[in-house]
């Protein structure tokens, strides 16, 4: 009886918590893609999806789980706590964790899976007297990301740990300001010493929702990357730290509604480390602080999803980017890519999708010589989805793909155990978001 009496208060507290409406108010969101596939030489072999499209060109399992809850709401003031973690297993086995797998050779030890903390932040509204509609936030966050879905290409995305004020009404549009940390980490290249990442802070200012003509709006923004090496890094023999310069990235995005779909045209210009963002399909969250003093670049992007009658929809991407004088000996790096994904709807749940993509990269040196890579990917997929829309998910796809390089001065022969310029893939993939 004493034991029973001891547990009664605890049981009552648990019951009260479960009965509370707030206990069930957790927002649950997420994303995943996963599947299985083979190629002409073992498991799937891919070609840069940002350049030629992602359909039938992804060999990973990737998942995000997001949990959030409004923890306070009183007198027009709210506080919301948001969180997200992500996992990337390689998909080769049942049990895939972060522990080491050595394959009988200590020099080949690696984990089956990577775990990442993507978001943990607080978002508050109603606290700013001059802008009660605005959101005051701090923590690690996905911040106003701009991307092209068919290629998984994020072209404006400074997400990370930071703070800011978002959505201040100013005339016809809204202003947002953020301070986010985007360190330049070591990748074994460009003269950086191992484990010596450099502190980089990004200041981001945006004005969004500017109305133009019918169904058209404009968003403009500026990002300023502040290179912040330590005194020890400045005094080191590594000239990359001494030469690191602050950089500016300017972005303008025009959105036009078309037949229930949309088309976006994006113009971007970057100086110093942002020159590499323009040339190498960067998003602004990675700053190439080691770029040569005076480097710059620009990028033009057009993308969208447009309905074509009752049975057809098409997604598309056009990208042209240039980086100038990014390192000693570099004159100009040019990149171009085009992707199209037409889709035919047989009924509300059954689709046939084709995706074709082509890219070309050219690296011109100051001595007049140049190196070129170019290639393409073709995919045909039979798809079943929860609805007929281009964006309907979950979706299950059976696909076959062919990928090939035309020019391969820099890429070499990446397929079939480094002996071939082309490959084919066959597989099944699921994708969902909620």
Curated annotation (Swiss-Prot):
It is a multi-pass membrane protein. Residues 1-25 form the signal peptide. The record marks 31, 62, 95, 262, 391, 433 as: Greasy slide, important in sugar transport. GO terms for biological process: monoatomic ion transport. GO terms for cellular component: cell outer membrane; pore complex. Its main location: membrane. Belongs to the porin LamB (TC 1.B.3) family. Keywords: Cell outer membrane, Ion transport, Membrane, Porin, Signal, Sugar transport, Transmembrane, Transmembrane beta strand, Transport. Homotrimer formed of three 18-stranded antiparallel beta-barrels, containing three independent channels. Involved in the transport of maltose and maltodextrins. GO terms for molecular function: maltodextrin transmembrane transporter activity; maltose transporting porin activity. It holds the Pfam family LamB. It is found in: Cell outer membrane. The record marks 154 as: Important in sugar transport. Induction: By maltose. This is Maltoporin. Gene3D superfamilies: Porin, LamB type. It comes from the Bacteria. It catalyses: beta-maltose(in) = beta-maltose(out). It comes from Aeromonas hydrophila.
């Amino acid at each position: 009886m004493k034991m029973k009496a001891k547990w009664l208060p605890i049981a009552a507290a648990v019951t009260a918590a479960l009965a509370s409406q707030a206990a069930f108010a957790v927002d649950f969101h997420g994303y995943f893609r996963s599947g299985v596939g083979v190629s002409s030489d073992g498991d799937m072999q891919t070609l840069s999806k940002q350049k030629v499209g992602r359909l039938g060109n992804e060999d990973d399992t990737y998942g995000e789980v997001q949990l959030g809850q409004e923890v306070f709401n009183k007198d027009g003031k709210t506080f919301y706590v948001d969180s997200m973690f992500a996992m990337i297993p390689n998909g080769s086995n049942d049990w895939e964790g972060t522990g080491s797998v050595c394959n009988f050779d200590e020099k080949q030890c690696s984990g089956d899976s990577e775990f990442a903390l993507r978001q943990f932040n607080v978002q508050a509204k109603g606290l700013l007297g001059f802008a009660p509609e605005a959101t005051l936030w701090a923590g690690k966050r996905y911040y106003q990301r701009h991307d092209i879905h068919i290629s998984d290409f994020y072209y404006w995305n400074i997400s990370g740990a930071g703070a800011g004020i978002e959505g201040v009404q100013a005339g016809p549009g809204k202003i947002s300001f953020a301070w986010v940390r985007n360190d330049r980490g070591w990748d074994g290249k460009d003269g950086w010493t191992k484990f010596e990442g450099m502190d980089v802070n990004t200041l981001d200012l945006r004005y969004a929702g500017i109305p133009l003509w019918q169904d058209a709006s404009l968003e403009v923004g500026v990002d300023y990357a502040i290179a912040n090496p330590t005194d020890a890094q400045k005094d080191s023999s590594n000239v990359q730290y001494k030469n690191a310069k602050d950089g500016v990235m300017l972005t303008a995005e025009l959105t036009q509604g078309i037949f229930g779909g949309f088309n976006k045209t994006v113009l971007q210009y970057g100086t110093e480390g942002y020159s590499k963002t323009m040339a190498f399909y960067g998003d602004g969250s990675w700053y190439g602080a080691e770029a040569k003093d005076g480097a710059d670049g620009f990028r033009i992007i057009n993308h969208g999803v447009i309905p074509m009658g009752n049975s057809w929809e098409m997604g598309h991407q056009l990208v042209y980017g240039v980086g100038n004088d990014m390192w000693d000996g570099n004159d100009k790096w040019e990149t171009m890519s085009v992707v199209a994904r037409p889709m035919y709807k047989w009924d509300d749940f059954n689709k046939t999708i084709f995706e074709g993509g082509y890219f070309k990269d050219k690296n011109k040196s100051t001595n007049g010589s140049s190196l070129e890579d170019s290639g393409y990917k073709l995919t045909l997929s039979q798809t079943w989805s929860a609805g007929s829309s281009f964006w309907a998910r979950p979706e299950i796809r059976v696909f076959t793909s062919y990928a090939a390089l035309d020019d391969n001065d820099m890429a070499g022969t990446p397929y079939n155990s480094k002996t071939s310029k082309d490959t084919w893939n066959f597989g099944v993939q699921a994708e969902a978001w909620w």
